[in-house]
């Protein structure tokens, strides 16, 4: 008998802006499923959310493993299949989460493609935590700014023959779930956006290696595109940065940077990355919707 595998889980295990009676910050575990996106850009399927508070004195991989076991059991009681993968976006918690996942049949995927979790966390920061006793109102000390690594060139075998800027109206992206593609990862479209708003992206072309390139990129967990100076950079995983193109003309780089900045404001940060055999080929070997969110 084949055991079904459920959607990936997204996990955050971290302190919250709430002081407990002992003067220590409250820790909390949040888990939710990565939503499946239908042909209209809407999330669907069995959704699972689970939360537990954790005393600061109990923050360790043992507590986390026991909590994960509870979450798996509760998901099973709801008729939901267990996931195979856990996505975790906090680099500082990676080792602890990995230790907790060992022995539970869960694979840790260091990734910032945790859009559902980030949205839930933002909602809790606005609506839930301020109502809790001990909530620390006002500005908190900001976390240390992440150290951005120098972009690394793509391996020779993963480079396309050419690439091009692209743009699609938001309404077209709602149909991405029905497009023919070998590798694909979509994200829910934020509500309330103008259907005609342009969403910027990049198309990579290779007549002989499009499928291989798409497969390689799929393992990177692509997050967002960035124009840094005269370089086009793909951010992926937790902190990886891959150089897609360099030595862009100054005017071209400036215009592209403005377009991507406008997308963050107008299109909820949405972007896309596509891999095709050629510009005239309708099929996508790879298609990823990305979303540029502020760094946590």
Region annotations inferred by a language model:
Residues 1-296:
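Secondary-structure boundary/capping micro-motif
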